[in-house]
Swiss-Prot record:
This is Very long-chain-fatty-acid--CoA ligase bubblegum. CDD domains: ACSBG_like. Keywords: ATP-binding, Fatty acid metabolism, Ligase, Lipid metabolism, Nucleotide-binding. Disruption phenotype: Adult neurodegeneration, with marked dilation of photoreceptor axons. Results in degeneration of lamina and retina, defects in the fenestrated basement membrane and ommatidial disarray. The phenotype is exacerbated in constant light conditions and improves in total darkness. Effects are probably due to elevated levels of very long chain fatty acids (VLCFAs). Feeding the fly mutant with glyceryl trioleate oil or medium-chain fatty acids, blocks the accumulation of excess VLCFAs as well as development of the pathology. It comes from the Eukaryota. It catalyses: a long-chain fatty acid + ATP + CoA = a long-chain fatty acyl-CoA + AMP + diphosphate. PANTHER family: AMP-DEPENDENT SYNTHETASE_LIGASE DOMAIN-CONTAINING PROTEIN (PTHR43272:SF32), LONG-CHAIN-FATTY-ACID--COA LIGASE (PTHR43272). ATP binds at residues 229-237, 417-422, 495, 510, 624. Mediates activation of long-chain fatty acids for both synthesis of cellular lipids, and degradation via beta-oxidation. Probably by regulating lipid storage and catabolism, plays a role in neuronal function. SUPFAM superfamilies: Acetyl-CoA synthetase-like (SSF56801). Its EC number is 6.2.1.3.
């Protein structure tokens, strides 16, 4: 009997259920696992509870979670304590009515309770379903309803208000639990509302046997996690991920990372855990390597992230491109306010460091000047950012411009692109440690497959993906599942690109984002937008328009200050924009000032010239921008143009600024 065959005859959680197909839309079904003949794809599968148990057995006294406790201190939970919390929460969920294959929704910022809820739901043979805190009540209802949620855990009274508003529309929902004070009035007045402290102190001895039976029935090839797509077209789809989808992807990520030291890794958790990349890295990968999670506070993306990084000094960091751009803007502002000698030294050091990477492609050249720059200047820069111990800086969720990568290379900080989807449990390709990778998303993870179909004359086509990390199907949505996942288990990503002779994958756009002009030309918007932004640092967003139009136009937003409380863009120009405006010989301090001046002719011409420079880099006349306009404020999450991971919602922007767009074609 093979090792895999033996998994069908053992108790859970590390067991397999018999299955007839590789895909399903039923949350109660199991799926077949596509085992490879050798390599990582042939390794024995493991469940999420099995992964945690193995780490607890070997590293039980190591720190697992650190939460801010007061102004400067942190409360630490070890892996043994973490597991004990998970068991308590799992039993409490069962006592509150959680049935097998039903979900627990979590509507909260990153915190230890998020982790306990996710692991607790999975250990109880339920399903974890994350919900973005920025979701409206209607969007929350969609997730809870479609995921068959029986319990929801929320962050605070604001989120509980959303639940209360839709509670009557959710007959399956049995309990709503609030983590933080001040507590909503419903917790005292109405049944079915609980404080988190009640979950931790609940007497669960009467469900002990039931819990152990549940845990023994957990199977590696059944659904344990639902991740919801962005919903840019229609309602978000629920991506069903099995234990093996997640734990196999985790193995691939760890194998691809540089110098992993089990028991010594640390990560700052700040990207929304509802996003597949954050959940896979923070909850599951960190547990796999017995790493320590440091929780950033709610305002991390509003300016407090650096403080958390300084406290944690992480060994790995994952960000979206906009986070790195914010770091860059801050560093540029600080540098411009320095004295002339400091500026000169910093400029020299950055030039030497960038040259080292561009010449050596990231391999240590041992150059004397590089060593001096690294030890005297770059070490201080890294320390100021909290990156003095970091081994991997990864960028995910959207393409990063080569210019931003070069800026960080000049600081001796190498950012590697990682690519994945909700449907691939988070990661499919990653740049290897020995590659600078300015224009690539890296190589396919070990044990996974990539191919490009429907190629054009240049060898560019649609990326298709196969491997044990590819999802089970969309919950209760057979049509969309069969559209995305073919009979040979290839996932059709919708991403366009190519692979070079060394195996490095590059993406050029998404098929759904491609603009088709009235003349039938296919235009990749992101490349053109990034080219325009590269030509003028004061531009925050360039949004290309031209679907079924005779020519291309672009909506421009300028970099401005941000309200630290709400996260909304202010009218006041950022330092970078102010320096640019002054260089033009005008004294405008706000976007309103610029627009009220006509718009300001000098500002207008500067943007126009930047677009002309970008147009010179176009491969055809059809890809040249003919007109533009300046929008009254920058894009943001609160104003609706950006999603939770700071990606532009293209359909939303097109609707919000429909009048401005029509004027460009009048």
């Amino acid at each position: 009997m093979s090792t895999i065959d033996a998994l069908y005859n053992r108790p859970g959680p590390n067991r397999l259920r018999q299955a007839d197909a590789y895909r399903t839309t039923n949350r109660q079904d199991a799926v077949k696992i596509r085992m490879a003949k050798d390599g990582i794809g042939a390794e024995e599968p493991i469940s999420v509870p099995g992964l945690l148990k193995r780490t607890v057995n070997n590293y039980g006294d190591y720190p697992a979670l650190r939460t801010k406790n007061g102004k400067n201190g942190y409360h630490t939970v070890t892996y043994k304590q973490y597991e004990q919390k998970v068991h308590q929460v799992a039993k409490a969920f069962i006592k509150l009515g959680l049935e097998e294959h039903h979900s627990v929704g979590v509507l909260a910022f990153n915190c230890a309770e998020w982790f306990y809820s996710a692991m607790g739901a999975i250990h109880a043979r339920g399903i974890i379903a994350g919900i973005y805190t920025t979701n409206s009540a209607d969007a929350v209802q969609h997730v809870l309803e479609s995921s068959h949620a029986q319990i929801v855990v929320v962050d605070d009274a604001k989120q509980m208000d959303k639940i209360h508003a839709i509670r009557d529309k959710l007959p399956k929902l049995k309990a709503a639990i609030q983590i933080q004070e001040p507590y909503s009035p419903y917790l005292k007045k109405e049944d079915g509302y609980y404080r988190w402290s009640e979950i931790e102190s609940m007497n669960v001895s009467d469900v002990e046997d039931q819990y152990m039976t549940r845990l023994e029935n957990v199977a590696i090839n059944e659904c344990c996690c639902l991740v919801y797509t962005s919903g840019t077209v229609g309602m978000p789809k629920g991506v069903m991920l099995s234990h093996d989808n997640i734990t196999f992807d985790v193995r691939g990520i760890v194998k691809a990372m540089d110098r992993v030291v089990v028991g010594a890794e640390s990560i700052v958790s700040y990207l929304p855990l509802s996003h597949v990349a954050a959940q896979t890295v923070d909850i599951y990968t960190c547990a796999f390597v017995a790493g320590c999670i440091w929780f950033a506070d709610k305002d991390a993306l509003k300016g407090t992230l650096v403080k958390s990084l300084q406290d944690a000094r992480p060994t790995r960091f994952m960000g979206v491109p906009r986070v790195y751009e914010k770091f860059q803007e801050r560093m540029v502002a600080v540098a411009s306010s320095s004295g002339s000698l400091k500026k000169m030294l910093a400029s020299w050091a950055k030039g030497i460091t960038l040259k080292h990477y561009m010449v050596s492609q990231g391999k240590s050249s041992g150059g004397f000047r590089y060593k001096i720059a690294k030890s005297l200047i770059m070490s201080k820069v890294k320390q100021a950012l909290g990156f003095d111990r970091v081994l991997t800086l990864a960028s995910a969720a959207a393409p990063m411009s080569p210019e931003t990568k070069k800026y960080f290379l000049s600081l001796d900080l190498k950012i590697v692109d990682a690519f994945g989807m909700s449907e691939t449990a988070g990661c499919h390709t990653i740049c290897l440690p020995d590659s600078v990778g300015l224009n690539t998303i890296g190589k396919t993870l070990p044990g996974c497959e990539s191919k490009f179909i429907n190629k054009d004359a240049n060898g560019h086509g649609e990326l298709c993906i196969r491997g044990r990390h590819v999802f089970m199907g969309y919950i209760d949505n057979k049509e969309k599942t069969e559209e995305s996942l073919d009979d040979d288990c290839w996932l059709h990503s919708g991403d366009l690109g190519f692979v070079d002779d060394k195996g490095y994958v590059s993406l050029t756009g998404r098929s759904k984002e491609i603009i088709i002009t009235a003349g039938g030309e296919n235009i990749p918007p992101v490349h053109i937008e990034n080219t325009i932004k590269k030509e003028l640092d004061a531009i925050s967003n360039a949004f290309l328009v031209g679907e079924q139009r005779k020519y291309l136009t672009v909506l421009i937003t300028l970099k401005t200050e941000v309200d630290k409380d709400s996260g909304e863009p202010l009218d006041e120009l950022s330092h970078e924009s102010s320096v640019w405006v002054k260089s033009l010989g005008v004294e405008h301090k706000t976007v309103s000032d610029i627009l009220a001046a006509g718009p300001c002719p000098k500002v207008w011409k500067s943007i126009e010239d930047a677009i002309k420079r970008a147009n010179k880099q176009s491969i055809s006349n059809a890809q040249k921008v003919q007109k533009f306009t300046i929008l009254p404020h920058d894009f943001s999450i609160p104003t609706g143009e950006l999603g939770p991971t700071l990606k532009v919602k293209r359909n939303v922007v097109s609707k919000m600024y429909a009048d401005e767009i029509e004027k460009l074609y009048a």
